[in-house]
């Protein structure tokens, strides 16, 4: 199963927040705006971290995290049967209280028919009463009826007639699944890679480490299928059976004399206490022995443990471990059958700034790995400061978190619907190759949308010359005038301030038809602009005319840059004012 919706209230900088999730979630935003708080709320729900009094939003005495799960497999439906809705989802809330306590509660789709309400089950334990009710066929044919049998019959009847019944959706008053505490991992495995972590911890042989989990799977497989391994375990069992004082209730005459002598000597010393000693040697768990004595070495020309390698390699190896576990689990899920297990097979991978210590090319490769991981039945959630871990064509996976003020707390902006269709989608995807670093726009204070490379080079250079350049502004080459509206759509959806810079394209040598096409392209830009977020600046008729220089057809950006750096260049006051407006 996977997270479908996430609702948070009163957690750290988050007063109230609800987001629709994706298989891949990329959380971005400025420092101290709530990215890590969003991740930590998810970790709190899964039991990976404990809440503290400082985690409560501004004086709140209660906080909660609600998660709705979808894509339940047959085993999940069986495990969480009580909570499965008509839409085959379940919703669970983890509540924490100031002072330390917490509890899980499930949302229950309650049938409005009184005879199907769980709280009324005790009224129907009389067989005479129960026999008149529609769910009677699901009860045992004879014997006394218990309240639990009535509840189970109610649930079976509801499942069989779910489309013909009316429901309300309410938070249960009792604990989730009737348990005072929910076992860690009941909703699936969580793998969390924080921003700062000692890679040696992941390669420790303990069961909770990433490597320990992977090694545990290998040892379990060997234990079940390797004949030599099974033979060794049997030999150990035979050996240790000789140390037992009794075998099947009969005294063991082959027991080593040294053990019996030690028992007798100890008993003799405590004769006045009427105390007698038995020494029992238990068979060691060879699986645990092997795991606890494992060590991992890395050889990149020099054989050392992983802690003595560079941070980049340490980070890469940890991520590789996680990816390997995901691949093995995918194969395991395909081969397994429904069982009576009480935990979900789901896996959630949570990364905090995974780009740390990795060069740009490695970051881009890592992002491809995350995409592959998210399309293999897993859910991947990460927060990042790197544009290399963002793909603009996956705009539905992008979550921009902002904290406008302390009173309202952190809020998320996301896009749930398709922005483009048909040719627009193709043009949007093609424009990636024109501007592969366009993911940077999501981190910008303001985005400057331009038609081509010459504009992208010249506008910042002129802004620098005029003393108005700002590093927090990003210039995006849209590839053509016709593509600018596509970017404006995206800016509007994510509420990113922007300015659209386009050519009027009314040159004297142009035909009426060409001018008409240019005007249509201009209108498409102006129609798309949201005046609360963006504005437009028109160049007459293009940047070359504004500069008063013909750059030629070859190497236009470089030729134009040489010109504005030369002593003969003087910018017109009208063009200078446009530059100031763009960088305002």
Report the location of each language-model feature.
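Conserved P-loop NTP-binding catalytic core
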Residues: 39-89
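Acidic, Mg2+-coordinating catalytic modules of nucleic-acid enzymes
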Residues: 86, 184, 434-449, 453-584
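Conserved catalytic network of the ASCE P-loop NTPase/AAA+ motor domain
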Residues: 19, 56-61, 83-87, 183-186, ...
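Glycine-rich phosphate-binding loops of NTPases
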Residues: 37, 74-237, 514-533, 554
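Short glycine-/polar-rich loops that comprise or flank the Walker A/P-loop
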Residues: 60-65, 87-92, 186-190, 346, ...
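Extended helical coiled-coil dimerization/tether regions that scaffold
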Residues: 185-187, 195-351, 510-511
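Switch/communication elements of ASCE P-loop NTPase nucleotide-binding domains
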Residues: 1-47, 258-261, 289-292, 296-437
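Short alpha-helical segments and helix-capping/turn motifs at coil-helix boundaries
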Residues: 49-52, 77-79, 166-183, 280-281, ...
């Amino acid at each position: 199963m996977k997270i479908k919706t996430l609702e948070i209230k009163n957690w750290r900088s988050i007063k109230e927040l609800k987001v629709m999730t994706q298989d891949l979630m990329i959380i971005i935003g400025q420092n101290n705006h709530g990215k890590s708080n969003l991740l930590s709320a998810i970790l709190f729900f899964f039991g990976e971290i404990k809440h503290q009094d400082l985690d409560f939003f501004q004086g709140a005495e209660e906080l909660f995290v609600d998660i709705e799960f979808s894509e339940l497999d047959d085993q999940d439906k069986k495990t969480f049967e009580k909570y499965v809705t008509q839409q085959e989802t379940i919703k669970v809330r983890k509540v924490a209280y100031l002072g330390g306590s917490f509890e899980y509660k499930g949302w229950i789709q309650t049938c409005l028919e009184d005879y199907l309400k769980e709280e009324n089950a005790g009224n129907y334990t009389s067989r005479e009463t129960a026999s008149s009710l529609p769910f009677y066929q699901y009860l045992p044919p004879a014997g006394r009826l218990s309240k639990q049998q009535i509840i189970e019959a109610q649930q079976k009847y509801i499942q069989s007639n779910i489309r013909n019944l009316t429901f309300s959706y309410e938070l249960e008053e009792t604990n989730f699944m009737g348990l005072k505490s929910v076992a860690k991992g009941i909703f699936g495995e969580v793998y969390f890679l924080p921003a700062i972590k000692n890679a040696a911890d992941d390669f420790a042989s303990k069961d909770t480490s990433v490597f320990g989990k992977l090694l545990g799977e290998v040892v379990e497989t060997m234990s079940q299928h390797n004949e030599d391994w099974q033979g060794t375990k049997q030999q150990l069992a035979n050996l240790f059976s000789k140390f037992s004082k009794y075998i099947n209730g009969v005294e063991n005459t082959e027991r080593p004399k040294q053990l019996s002598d030690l028992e007798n000597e100890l008993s003799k010393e405590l004769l006045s206490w009427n105390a007698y000693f038995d020494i029992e040697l238990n068979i060691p768990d060879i699986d645990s022995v092997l795991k606890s004595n494992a060590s991992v070495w890395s050889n990149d020309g020099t054989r050392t443990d992983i802690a003595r390698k560079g941070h980049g390699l340490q980070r890469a190896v940890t991520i590789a471990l996680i990816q390997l576990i995901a691949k093995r689990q995918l194969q395991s899920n395909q081969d397994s059958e429904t069982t009576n297990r009480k935990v979900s097979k789901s896996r959630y991978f949570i990364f905090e700034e995974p780009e740390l210590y990795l060069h740009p090319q490695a970051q881009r490769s890592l992002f491809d790995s995350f995409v592959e991981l998210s399309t293999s039945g897993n859910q991947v959630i990460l927060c990042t400061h790197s544009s290399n871990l963002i793909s603009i064509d996956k705009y539905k996976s992008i979550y921009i978190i902002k904290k406008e003020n302390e009173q309202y707390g952190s809020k998320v902006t996301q896009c749930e619907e398709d922005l483009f269709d048909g040719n627009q989608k193709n043009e949007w995807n093609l424009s990636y190759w024109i501007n592969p670093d366009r993911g940077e726009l999501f981190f910008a204070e303001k985005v400057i949308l331009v038609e081509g490379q010459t504009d992208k080079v010249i506008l910042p250079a002129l802004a620098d010359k005029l003393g108005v350049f700002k590093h927090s502004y990003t210039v995006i080459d849209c590839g053509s005038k016709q593509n600018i509206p596509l970017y404006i759509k995206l800016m509007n959806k994510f509420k990113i301030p922007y300015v659209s810079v386009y050519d009027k394209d009314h040159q004297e040598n142009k035909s009426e038809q060409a001018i008409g096409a240019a005007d249509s392209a201009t209108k498409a830009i102006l129609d798309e602009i949201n005046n609360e977020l963006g504005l437009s600046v028109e160049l007459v008729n293009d940047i070359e005319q504004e500069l008063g220089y013909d750059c030629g057809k070859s190497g236009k950006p470089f030729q134009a840059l040489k010109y504005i750096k030369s002593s003969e260049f003087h910018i017109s006051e009208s063009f200078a004012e446009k530059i100031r407006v763009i960088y305002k």
